[in-house]
Swiss-Prot record:
Catalyzes the formation of pyridoxal 5'-phosphate from ribose 5-phosphate (RBP), glyceraldehyde 3-phosphate (G3P) and ammonia. The ammonia is provided by the PdxT subunit. Can also use ribulose 5-phosphate and dihydroxyacetone phosphate as substrates, resulting from enzyme-catalyzed isomerization of RBP and G3P, respectively. Belongs to the PdxS/SNZ family. Coiled coil: none annotated. It is an enzyme of class 4 (lyase). GO terms for molecular function: pyridoxal 5'-phosphate synthase (glutamine hydrolysing) activity. The lineage of its organism: Bacteria, Bacillati, Chloroflexota, Chloroflexia, Chloroflexales. This is Pyridoxal 5'-phosphate synthase subunit PdxS. In the presence of PdxT, forms a dodecamer of heterodimers. It comes from the Bacteria. Its EC number is 4.3.3.6. The keyword Membrane does not apply. The gene is pdxS.
Amino acid sequence: MDKSTWTTKVGLAQMLKGGVIMDVVTPEQARIAEEAGAVAVMALERVPADIRAQGGVARMSDPELILAIKEAVTIPVMAKARIGHFVEAQILEALGIDYIDESEVLTPADEEHHINKHKFRVPFVCGCRNLGEALRRVAEGAAMLRTKGEAGTGNVVEAVRHARAVYSEIRRLQSMDEDELFTYAKNIQAPYELVRQVAETGRLPVVNFAAGGIATPADAALLMQLGVDGVFVGSGIFKSGDPARRARAIVAATTHYNEPEIIAEVSRGLGEAMVGIEISKIPHDQLMAERGW
C-alpha cells in the first residue's frame, strides 16, 4: 500500500484544531469523553499519574483494550508507543488506530533514535520542549506536536514553560537574516528548510497542542491564550471528583478561551481537582519531559 504523504497526515491532524483530546482507560471513560465534546481520545492502560505512582516499565497498551475503546466511540482514537519502538507503532497501525503518540510518558525503548515516522501511513504526534525538539520531530515525520509538560502531575507550569519557549523562539527567528538562520538551524540540529519556513510563516509547520499537567478549565484557557492549537488532558479529568462535568468544562474553556465570563461559569462546582505534585519535589531521573532528544 502506498504511504500517505506527510502533507495528508498534517491535514488529518489539522482537523483536531481547537479541540480537547482526553486520556481514557476504559470504554466507559471513552464514551464520557465523547459525550463531553472531546475531538479524540487517547487509549491507555494507565493514566500518567498512575504510571508515575506505580513505577516500573510503561509499555504500549494491550491491543484488546485499545480495540474495545475504538469500538466504543465514533471519534478518532490515539494510542501511545514508546520512543524509538517502531514495532509497537507497527502494531498500532495494524490495529487501525487513527493517530500514534510517540510518547515520553512511556519508558523509552531506544535512547538514541526516535521512530522514522515517514514509514507509516498513520499520523504521529510527538512532544517537544523547545523549537529544536519540535522541528527535529517534524523532520522525522511528525504530523502534530504537543508540549511535553510534566505528565501526571496536575501542575501546568512545565506545559506553560514549553509553550512559551517554542513561541518565543519563533518570534526570535523572524528577526534573523539568512546567515543567522543557517547558524541557528545548525545549533538546534534542525533542517535549514524547516527553520526558514517557520521564520517566513511565523508558525510551526504542524498543529501544536498543549499537554502535561492540565487539570482545570483555567489551565486549558491559559495555554490556548498562549497560542497552542488545542489541549490534551490526561490524569486531570478521571482523577478528579466529577469527571463528566470537568470534561465538559474543559472543552467549553478551550472553545471560549478568550471569554472569562464563560470560563468562570463552567468552573463553578466542579468538585475536587486531582491532587497535584510540585515539580521541584520530583527526583530528576523521574521527570518524563527529559526523555527524548
